[in-house]
């Protein structure tokens, strides 16, 4: 600053310093005349110009330095604020992470609970469907029971079936005092008429013995009177009935032939 002040001082205020100059130098200065005057002015102008330029540069530097410093400080502050914001964001993200995990857990739990509820609803629907089908079956059975003829069919299915075959009874059959034998004979006839019964009887049981037929030489004349009960005639009628049954005639003919031979002897 002192140098600048010295440079800025005008020429008329500069102190004069007494110097001992030789007479030769004074004569040279006076001899040159105008040329010396111009040369001195040029020399004097140059340091003033440099001083003004330096002062302007220093002034600009002084003005620009605080501006740059302020800008630099603002940049630093901005950087600090940005860093703080980033740190806050990271902290918020870290704080939000467990909340996201909790949300996932909640969603999983809600989905599992919803799936459980759906499973229970499906089970209830299945139960209702089964119950409805059972109710329908019960109603159908009740309706069938109310229908005519349904009860008889169920009874027939439960009770074993017994078939009865009508036996042709001749008009000449006479009542006798042995009803048990007649019953046995009728049962045997019915069994013989059943399919497959005759073969089993032939294999398991021995040859059936039947009463011989009584052959009369003189035919009996028809009379209007009631016939007298004779056990031989009764047996003959039963044998005739047996002969009419299928599967019985062959055995009776063979036995009759044998009996005729024995009677001839």
Curated annotation (Swiss-Prot):
Identification of the protein by name: Dehydrin COR47
Family note: Belongs to the plant dehydrin family.
Positions where Phosphoserine occurs in the chain: 64
Residues bearing PTM Phosphothreonine: 90
PANTHER family: DEHYDRIN COR47-RELATED, DEHYDRIN XERO 2-RELATED
Phylogenetic lineage: Eukaryota, Viridiplantae, Streptophyta, Embryophyta, Tracheophyta
Disordered: region residues: 1-265
GO cellular component: cytosol; nucleus
Amino acid composition bias (Polar residues), ranges on this chain: 16-28
GO molecular-function term, one example from the UniProt record: copper ion binding
Biased composition (Low complexity): 160-172
Keywords on record: Acetylation, Phosphoprotein, Repeat, Stress response
Disulfide bonds: none
Pfam families per UniProt: Dehydrin (PF00257)
Expression triggers: By cold shock, abscisic acid (ABA) and drought stress.
Chain positions with N-acetylalanine modification: 2
Region (3 X 21 AA repeats, Lys-rich): 133-251
GO biological process, one term: response to cold
Classification via InterPro entries: Dehydrin (IPR000167), Dehydrin_CS (IPR030513)
Annotated Basic and acidic residues bias: 1-14, 29-47, 69-79, 96-105, 129-156, 173-204, 227-265
Spans of repeat Sequence: 133-153, 180-200, 231-251
């Amino acid at each position: 600053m002192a140098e600048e002040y010295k440079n800025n001082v005008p020429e008329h205020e500069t102190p004069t310093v007494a110097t001992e100059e030789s007479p030769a130098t004074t004569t040279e200065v006076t001899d040159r005349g105008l040329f010396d005057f111009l040369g001195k002015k040029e020399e004097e102008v140059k340091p003033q110009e440099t001083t003004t330029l330096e002062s302007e540069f220093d002034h600009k530097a002084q003005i620009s330095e605080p501006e740059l410093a302020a800008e630099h400080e603002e940049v630093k502050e901005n950087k600090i604020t940005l860093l703080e914001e980033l740190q806050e964001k990271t902290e918020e993200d870290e704080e939000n992470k467990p909340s996201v995990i909790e949300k996932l857990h909640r969603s999983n739990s809600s989905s599992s609970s919803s799936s459980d509820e759906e499973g229970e609803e499906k089970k209830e629907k299945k139960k209702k469907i089964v119950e409805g089908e059972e109710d329908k079956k019960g109603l159908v059975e009740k309706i069938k029971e109310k229908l005519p003829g349904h009860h008889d069919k169920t009874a027939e299915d439960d009770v074993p079936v017994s078939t009865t075959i009508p036996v042709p009874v001749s008009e000449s059959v006479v009542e006798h005092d042995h009803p048990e034998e007649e019953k046995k004979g009728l049962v045997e006839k019915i069994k013989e008429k059943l399919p497959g019964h005759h073969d089993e009887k032939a294999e398991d049981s021995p040859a059936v013995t039947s009463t011989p037929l009584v052959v009369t030489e003189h035919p009996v004349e028809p009379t209007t009177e009631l016939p007298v009960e004779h056990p031989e005639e009764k047996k003959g009628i039963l044998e005739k009935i047996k002969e009419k049954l299928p599967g019985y005639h062959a055995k009776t003919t063979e036995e009759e032939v044998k009996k005729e031979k024995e009677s001839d002897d």
